[in-house]
Amino acid sequence: KVIVRGFVLMALGWVCNGLLKLEFAELRFWSVLARIGMAWMAGALIYMHVRHWKHIAAVILVLLVGYSLASSLLVAPDMPEADALTRAGNIACYIDRTLFGVHCYRPDYDPEGLLSTVPAIGTALLGMLAGRWIKWEHKGLTGTRKALGMCCAGVILGLVGYLWSFWTPINKALWSSSFVCVVACYSLLMLALFYYVIDVRRWRSWDFFFVVIGMNSIAIYMLPRFISFGF
C-alpha cells in the first residue's frame, strides 16, 4: 500500500504537469506531488523497518549530513569552475539536467529533483516522529507536555538550521539540510500550537474551515490546474 500510494501521488503530479494533454516530449517528470510521494514512500518504508526513534533520528542525521556534504563539496563535472552551491555547479542540479534534460522545471535544474529528494525524506521522517510523539502514551506525559516537547524540539531544530546555514545556506530550491531544519522548526511550533488549542484545550468551534482544507489538501492543490478562478 505504501508503494502504491507513493506512485499514485507521482501520477497525480504528472497530471498536474499536463499528462492528459498527451504531449510527452517536454512533460516535466518531477513535481511537488511527486516530491511528496517519493519522500513519503521512502520515509514510510524506513519507518516501518527501523522502529526505535533513536535509530530513525540517526537515519535523518545521515541523510542530512550526507546531502549537505555532497551539495557543498561536489561540483558538477560539466561546470568544474562553478561554485557548488549555484545552479550551474551544484551536483543535484547536474544530475537532474543530465538524467531528465527538457523534462526538468527549468533547463538547468529542477527544484523537486532526484538528489534533493534525499533531504526531503528527512523532512518526512521528522513528521512521522512528531506523529509518534503525539500518539505516545506514557504515565505523566500530558497533552500540555507533548506540546511543550514539540516547542522545544522546534527551537532546537531552528538553532541547528541557523548554525548549519553558515555551511550550506537555507535554500528551498536545493532543499538544503539547513532548510529542512528551519522548516521543521516552524512546522513543529505551529503543530504544537494547534495541537494544544484543539486537542488539549478542546477549543474547536472555529476549526471546521481548517479541517476541511487539511482533509482535502491534495484536491485543493490540484483544482486550480483545471479550473480558473480568475486570480
Segments the model singles out, each with a brief description of its role:
Residues 1-231:
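Alpha-helical transmembrane segments and their immediate juxtamembrane cytosolic regions
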